Amino acid sequence: MIERVKGTRDFLPEDMAKRRWVFEKIREVFEAYGFKEILTPVMEYTKLFQLRSGEEVVKQLYAFKDKGGRDVSLRPDMTSSVARLYVNSFQMAPKPIKWYYIANMFRYEEPQSGRYREFWQAGVELIGSDKVEADAEVIALFVESYLSTGLRDFTVNIGDRILLDEFAGMLGVSDDIGLMRIIDKRDKLSQEEFINLLKEFGLGESEIEKVLELVEIKGRPDNVLPLAEELFKSKKAKEEISKLYKLTDLLEWYGVKDWIRIDLGIARGFDYYTSIVFEAISPNELGIGSIGGGGRYDNLIEIFGGKPTPATGFAIGIERLLPILEWKGLIPKPQTGPEVFVIPLKDMEKVAINIAVKLRREKIKTDIELSGRKLGKALDYANRVGAKLVIIVGKRDVERGVVTIRDMESGEQYNVSLNEIVDKVKNLLKR
């Protein structure tokens, strides 16, 4: 027997109904904000991801040579692909460009709660504006996307890569990305493990104390940003903190400030982020951490051969969000069975087909008995698959111009004229 590939899953009808519900909730909000859907190839040249995705992501690539000897990889994220698409075809398009996607990604990592080797993300990219208003628009959409699913218990934590760069300079550290990677892991480590990593990196006691001070600068913007002003003295840092003040003020006007926190220890795992970064956390007992994140990447398009073009965006981790929504009871029980099941008795198949066609054309989910079962077994099947109504098409009834409709929940039966079947079904289904 051939097994399923490790780290992947099969989605059954009930699973797909739940996923589709989440996708559509998020899609509605994306489109309400003026974003338009795109999809890029699942494969790209490996070099695209090696240029700027980050050491950890590059290590996790599903990379191989195709039959032409070209190095290709399954996409580990969409931002690089979107930047490539922009450079290829849209540099002269009106700005800003607002795109969204709902797509699957691949990373060779150890499967665990909320983490798989094939996973889905819903995300947006806003290309062509370096204004803090663009950051506010994207972060507000990030918050609204979670709210659209009924989730309320979450926070969006905002950090800044420029401030981390300035902090590395304050410590005299030349390998700022190396320091960021350690800081970014702090929530996954004990205090002792975190300090040991900083020591191995080459920091002394006084520098480690400053790092510990930095990672504690987190909380509501009004409380945290004054602390950041005390820690950072350079002109560049002051300008960035001023931007964070403006950002949080704008987010208040969007009506989402209650979900916003500042966390200056956030770096995110991708090397292409250049300024504001953010991630969403929802408390849970499932072992799931971040449920999505994003940030500004003003240099990526230039690295891929385009003209310097600012951009910002985010991705929501569906495999992380969906279990939390289920755990909190926020996903409606899906209706995977037919709304109507039509059972033809002897020689009544053509009439049954005609009835099914009329219902289907009214977008009523209709199935038909195709196995030739006797009435009792066909009714058992209809009950097992969750049909709400059964239409029994018998020869004597049809000769009188009627059929029998049975409500499977109440057990009530109705003799209904052939010409009134659609209206009666809609009435019983409360359409």
Swiss-Prot record:
Source domain of life: Archaea
GO terms for biological process, alphabetical: histidyl-tRNA aminoacylation; L-histidine biosynthetic process
Name by which UniProt lists this protein: Histidine--tRNA ligase
SUPFAM superfamilies cross-referenced by the UniProt entry: Class II aaRS ABD-related, Class II aaRS and biotin synthetases
Disulfide-bonded cysteines: none
Gene Ontology cellular-component terms listed: cytoplasm
Compartment annotation: Cytoplasm
GO MF assignments: ATP binding; histidine-tRNA ligase activity
Similarity remark: Belongs to the class-II aminoacyl-tRNA synthetase family.
Keywords: Aminoacyl-tRNA synthetase, ATP-binding, Cytoplasm, Ligase, Nucleotide-binding, Protein biosynthesis
Catalysed reactions, semicolon-separated: tRNA(His) + L-histidine + ATP = L-histidyl-tRNA(His) + AMP + diphosphate + H(+)
Assigned EC number: 6.1.1.21
InterPro entries, A to Z: aa-tRNA-synth_II, aa-tRNA-synth_II/BPL/LPL, Anticodon-bd, Anticodon-bd_dom_sf, His-tRNA-ligase, HisRS-like_core, HisRS/HisZ, HisRS_anticodon
